[in-house]
Amino acid sequence: MKRIGNIRDTHGYLDTIDLVLDATMDQNIDMWLHAGDYGDDARYMQTRTDVPVYAVRGNNDRVHPLEPKEQLIPLEDTYIYMTHGHEVSYDKRIQELVHVGNAMGARLIVCGHSHVYKKELLGDTLFVNPGSIALPRDGSGGTFAIVTYEDGAFDVECVYKQDII
């Protein structure tokens, strides 16, 4: 079993990152994904945790050219495809990113950009956008996600900021 913390669009609000990391300290997270906006936030996360933190750059990360635009991350018998998602039209985003990720062998597709939580299962592929813990655009008060992968199946927990304060 693998547990994957999924956060993005933190935009420099390190206090929200601290809140998330403190709240999940005893939840056996195996890795963290930060899909852009801001790259420095992902580097900060790495100083606060002993597990790998994978990051990609977003549309507000122009000053962070070292972060890749996309990553393919091994996950047991499959892969995670991660990108910020701002270069794909909103109405076609899920289908296009799933298509790209599947072509690379990924069954978990993660992106950000919209600041709105979304999960969708397309066949055996899971698409997750954990929203934004810092600047939500959906009235949620802020969200992040924890994805569990066990015996070839995914489970997603949407965690609301008000539940960890």
Residue ranges and their predicted role:
Residues 19, 76, 102-105, 128-165:
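Binuclear metal-dependent phosphoesterase catalytic core
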Residues 1-51, 61, 66-69, 140-143, ...:
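N-terminal active-site segment of His-dependent metallophosphoesterases
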Residues 76, 84, 88-122, 127, ...:
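Catalytic core of the metallo-beta-lactamase
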Residues 48, 52-95:
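Helix-adjacent hinge/juxtasegments
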